[in-house]
Each structure stands twice: as C-alpha cells, then as structure tokens.
C-alpha cells in the first residue's frame, strides 16, 4: 500500500489504490 498516495501499488504490494484520477482511496 502506497503511503505517498500513489495510484499504483509498489513492488510486492496488493493493488489497493485506485487508478487515476481518483487516488484518495489508497490505504494510508
């Protein structure tokens, strides 16, 4: 889960973040 609000998950992370243009639902 991206802590920086990235729309895409980092390596080894689940795709919990929304795609553009909505990135506010990323797990914090």
UniProtKB/Swiss-Prot annotation:
Record key words, sorted: Disulfide bond, Neurotoxin, Secreted, Toxin
Single annotated GO MF: toxin activity
Tissue spec: Expressed by the venom duct.
Subcellular location: Secreted
GO CC terms in record: extracellular region
Processing after translation: Contains 2 disulfide bonds that can be either 'C1-C3, C2-C4' or 'C1-C4, C2-C3', since these disulfide connectivities have been observed for conotoxins with cysteine framework V (for examples, see AC P0DQQ7 and AC P81755).
Disulfide feature: none
Family per similarity comment: Belongs to the conotoxin T superfamily.
Domain remark text: The cysteine framework is V (CC-CC).
Name of this chain's protein: Conotoxin Cl5.3
Organism per entry: Californiconus californicus
Upper classification of the organism: Eukaryota, Metazoa, Spiralia, Lophotrochozoa, Mollusca
């Amino acid at each position: 889960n991206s802590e920086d609000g990235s729309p895409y998950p980092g390596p080894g992370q689940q795709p919990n973040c929304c795609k553009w243009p909505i990135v506010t639902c990323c797990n914090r």
